[in-house]
Amino acid sequence: MRSMKAIIEYLLKQALINLQQSGEMPIDLEVEIKVENAKDPSHGDYATNLALVLAKPCRQAPKVLAERLVAVIPADPSVEKIEIAGAGFINFFMRSTARSLIISEILNKGKEFGRGNLGQSQKVLIEFVSANPTGPLHVGHGRGAAFGATLGNVLKAAGYDVTLEYYVNDAGRQMNILAVSVWLRYLELAGEPIVFPTNGYKGQYVYEIAQEMWSEQGNQFVHPWISVVENLPADEPEGGDKETYIDAIIARAQSLLGKDGFANFHQHALKTVLDDIKDDLQAFGVRFDSWFSEQSLFEDGSIEKGIQALKDRGHTYEREGALWFRATDFGDEKDRVLVRANGQTTYFASDVAYHWNKYDRGFDRVIDIFGADHHGYVTRIKTAVKALGHDESALDVILVQFAILYRGGDRVQMSTRSGSFVTLRELREEVGNDAARYFYVARKPEQHMDFDLDLAKSESSDNPVYYIQYAHARICSVLRQLKERGLKWDKDMGLKNLDLLEQQHETTLISLIARYPEVIQSAAASCEPHQLAYYLRELANGLHSYYNAIQLLCEQEQLRCARLCLLESVRQVLNNGLAILGVSAPESM
């Protein structure tokens, strides 16, 4: 069954064709038909500004054009009347019978209601979170996790074939810093008088990993502290450069431990942290289809293949012993190094290889979800994709602002290396998964977010997730009361008497639940899950108003059964929408 908005869009399209065929409108005119939900019930159910959009290219007054459009709109049993308002807006009033049909559809489809075929099984890869496996996820990562998972659910509901992927940065410098941090704590456990580097990872988890290494490996990797720091440059507290110092101490560790010894610390730290990240995300309801290793790009030759693909297309050149990508040819501010003069590939080369790999796996569309601090990567990634021969429109890069946590009115600073951060796990334990999942997606991803812990934990109408869940629980409570009072709910009787639902609260609710498929399609088309979060709050508000104003379990059986059909439809839509957000739908609260 087509949505009411889809019906109106079709009718308007036919009206345009009629005007073009009659010569009253240019035959080559193309326009996007936009139909919006009417904000004021007195203006109908839906409205369009099509006449205002077409006025200039058609050289006609908007109101005159609106009259011509309305005159040739085909008749449809779903539409009661059409009115022209203001400067040329066209308002549609739907028949109550058409609105009521949505209740029957919801009850028949259940959990499948709202699912569509916008995506037509197009293969989409969403890469998100992808935090360096150098420590636990913090509350900033949590927003990207919730957003990516919810976007995946929205796209699946809209008919896309979605794969969720976490890119594991297991081949970079940060992993070496973690490995050497663990080794230094290991030396500390052995009694060595270490001075921990300014740029090392300082969290409690580093001690715990070091303790595991000490318990499993004994003292076989112990070296005197003097041999570790001998002839090294100064660290920052001694007037040196912390980056130079940490690189030097990594090189010393690799020399003293040997390739296999250093790899032992590297792999143990990686596995421990990555397992913790996986457990954390699993508990948060975020499940990935693929965990893609950066190291695999080196092992399977993807790095070389990606670079070669750019070479073959003539998009590289050599300068001062390094291999460069002609990024400026594709709109970047400067060219980018792929291979340094010493033969080492750059992070950018890994990015090129990874995206070459994504398209090589047959995905039609790629969505990268980055933290806002990665804004500088957007242009260079897009230029690489374009240079590799792919349509730039097949890549979407969405930047998610990190959430800022406030406790007692104070902002909590977060830094992985300093070890002073609030983890996602701690946040979940304090406010619960449901509040975290909802709050994280309740705003546009590019908007800054202040996470109010007090609000997230409150049991009031000010807390949106509580308000929505309470609406679901209230409906379940009514159904329980039905049994307790020995009353019947005959669904067939209710469906035959939906015309009895004439109260303003009832017609409002019917209009709201009819919008659900449109919300899913719109959220998917724009990659904006917050639209669903807003909608569910609006639906919950409609339910609470109805609950407070109307005697739901009335004595008149036909009306009672009709109202229960409406209530069950609202409950189903709330359930379906909350499931997409990754939020539970409790039956009692």
Swiss-Prot record:
Q: Which residues does UniProt assign to the signal peptide?
A: none
Report which superkingdom the organism of origin falls in: Bacteria
One short Pfam name that applies is DALR_1
Q: Where is this motif: 'HIGH' region?
A: 131-141
Q: What is its main location?
A: cytoplasm
Q: Which keywords accompany this UniProt record?
A: Aminoacyl-tRNA synthetase, ATP-binding, Cytoplasm, Ligase, Nucleotide-binding, Protein biosynthesis
GO function term, MF aspect, one: arginine-tRNA ligase activity
Q: What class of enzyme is it?
A: ligase
Q: Name one GO cellular component term.
A: cytoplasm
According to its UniProt entry, the protein's GO biological process terms are: arginyl-tRNA aminoacylation
Q: What is its EC number?
A: 6.1.1.19
Reactions mediated catalytically:
tRNA(Arg) + L-arginine + ATP = L-arginyl-tRNA(Arg) + AMP + diphosphate
Under PROSITE patterns, the record lists: AA_TRNA_LIGASE_I
Task: Give the subcellular location.
Answer: Cytoplasm
InterPro entries xref list: aa-tRNA-synth_I_CS, Arg-tRNA-ligase, Arg-tRNA-synth_N, Arg-tRNA-synth_N_sf, ArgRS_core, DALR_anticod-bd, Rossmann-like_a/b/a_fold, tRNAsynth_Ia_anticodon-bd
Q: Which Gene3D superfamilies does the annotation name? A: Arginyl tRNA synthetase N-terminal domain, HUPs, Isoleucyl-tRNA Synthetase, Domain 1
Assigned protein family: Belongs to the class-I aminoacyl-tRNA synthetase family.
| Subunit description | Monomer.
Q: Which NCBIfam families match?
A: argS
Spell out the protein name for this chain.
Arginine--tRNA ligase
Gene name linked to the record: argS
